[in-house]
């Protein structure tokens, strides 16, 4: 019985310490400075909006550049695949298969000729 009380007390202590150490939002010195100024001057709210908008646009541009880089890689892979297909097509020309009379294949719910 005493060991379970000790375990519960330690678990409660761990939870309390983790709650105290975790902050709700990341701390940013510039953002905090803008917020302090906004209390004093209403024109700073516009600066805060510009700052957050500029930061958001910068993050979007960075993400877009990463996407474009991956598109270039996929395009290079596609062109490589197209080149391989052209090499295969340039190989010996095979005559089309001769169809036997009365031969039928079942394809997508219908019978087709061989």
Curated annotation (Swiss-Prot):
Q: Name the InterPro entries for this protein.
A: Somatostatin (IPR004250), Somatostatin/Cortistatin_C (IPR018142)
In the record, what terms sit under GO molecular function? hormone activity
Q: Which Pfam family, just one, is annotated for this protein?
A: Somatostatin
Localization annotation: Secreted
The primary location reported for this protein is secreted
Extract the signal peptide range. 1-24
Keywords (alphabetical) are: Cleavage on pair of basic residues, Disulfide bond, Hormone, Secreted, Signal
Intrachain S-S bonds? 103-114
Q: Under which name does UniProt file this protein?
A: Somatostatin-1
According to its UniProt entry, this protein's organism is Ictalurus punctatus (Channel catfish)
